[in-house]
A protein has these predicted regions:
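Bacterial N-terminal signal peptides that target proteins for export
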Residues: 1-11
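Bacterial N-terminal signal peptides
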Residues: 10-19
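Sec/Tat signal peptide C-region and signal peptidase I cleavage site
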Residues: 20-26
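Transmembrane beta-barrel domains of Gram-negative outer membranes and organellar outer membranes
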Residues: 27-190, 197-200, 229-233, 242-245, ...
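A mid-sequence, solvent-exposed acidic-amphipathic segment
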Residues: 192-240
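A cross-kingdom marker for long, charged
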Residues: 276-277, 288
Length: 295
């Protein structure tokens, strides 16, 4: 990651922490007081932030509202024809204003590893550290024409730098910047989300960042639409555009999902995910399964 981007990431994270310090008055904090409407904290993305499965939303993790601190943890498994992807992590939401998150991603190359020359069953690993700040608006309440808007940063660090560089990546770590707008139209039971992401990640960062040929940051889009059939059950679809810095035919992502709140604190998500071509192996479509516990 270039020095200007490192500086921007540091400044962005600092601003989020300053906002946290301004809001965090110990005498007013309700620890783990879960007062949000069920499902309105979203689920956990594969990168650890709150949102959908593959798209970040403006939501803040945990079930705490403006006077509390909440926490959530997730485990996600994606089963594809040639790969296996697992993510687990934790997120903290502070006063429905600031979110801090961490996720570890493990990407099993199975037989593809041998074909690519990195070894049968070689697993790519990545750490993702995230921070998000709600700027204005409310997901549920207020003017229906004013969404909840948040900015975020996700610093990603591949633990397989040699592999990333071997496929042509310029670096083994990088930072994504997001701007999200999300609104739940409660009277119609419809949720809509749009996210702009500035990124140089290859396959979410698992194959490094940028390219040795000079390709770097580009602006990508993430969108989600969901319908809430009941207080506890929602179905929807997501779409996420991807850069192709390495020239390996990296495709956009999409999924169709269903999420069910088994209890106020446990949400299960199942989806059909189409991740397209990954490292030249096409038609990577399969099951996305996730469990989230939130307080």
């Amino acid at each position: 990651m270039t020095l200007p981007m490192r500086t921007a990431a540091t400044i962005g994270t600092g601003l989020l922490l300053m906002a946290f310090a301004q809001d965090a008055r110990a005498e007013d904090i309700d620890w783990l007081a879960g007062d949000k409407l069920v499902l309105t904290n979203g689920v956990s993305t594969i990168e650890g932030a709150s949102g959908g499965g593959i798209a970040s939303w403006s939501t803040i993790a945990g079930r705490a509202t403006d006077s509390g601190i909440g926490i959530s943890g997730h485990v996600t498994i994606v089963e594809l024809p040639d790969y296996g992807w697992q993510s687990h992590g934790v997120s903290i939401g502070v006063m429905n204003r600031v979110e801090l998150s961490y996720a570890r991603q493990n990407f099993d190359t199975r037989d593809v590893g041998a074909a690519l020359g990195i070894g049968q069953g070689y697993t790519l690993n990545q750490d993702v550290f995230g921070a998000k700040l709600r700027l204005f608006g409310d997901l549920v309440y207020g003017d229906p024409l004013v969404p909840q808007v948040s900015v975020g940063v996700q610093h990603k660090r591949s633990l397989d730098g040699a592999v990333a560089r071997a496929v042509g990546a310029a670096d083994d770590e990088g930072t994504d910047f997001t701007l999200s707008a999300t609104k739940l139209f409660l009277a119609h039971s419809v949720l809509v989300n749009a996210t702009a992401r500035l990124t140089e990640a290859n396959q979410n960062g698992l194959l490094g960042f940028g390219s040795a040929a000079g390709k770097g940051y580009s602006l990508q889009f993430e969108g989600s639409v969901a319908y809430q059939f009941s207080r506890r059950f929602v179905v929807g679809a997501e779409f996420r555009t991807k850069p192709d810095n390495l020239g390996l035919g990296e495709d956009d992502w999409l999924d169709v999902f269903a999420a069910y709140a088994v209890t106020d604190n446990l949400t299960l998500t199942a989806a059909y995910a189409d991740l397209g071509s990954i490292a030249t192996f096409e038609n990577q479509r399969g099951a996305f399964l996730s469990a989230q516990v939130a307080f």
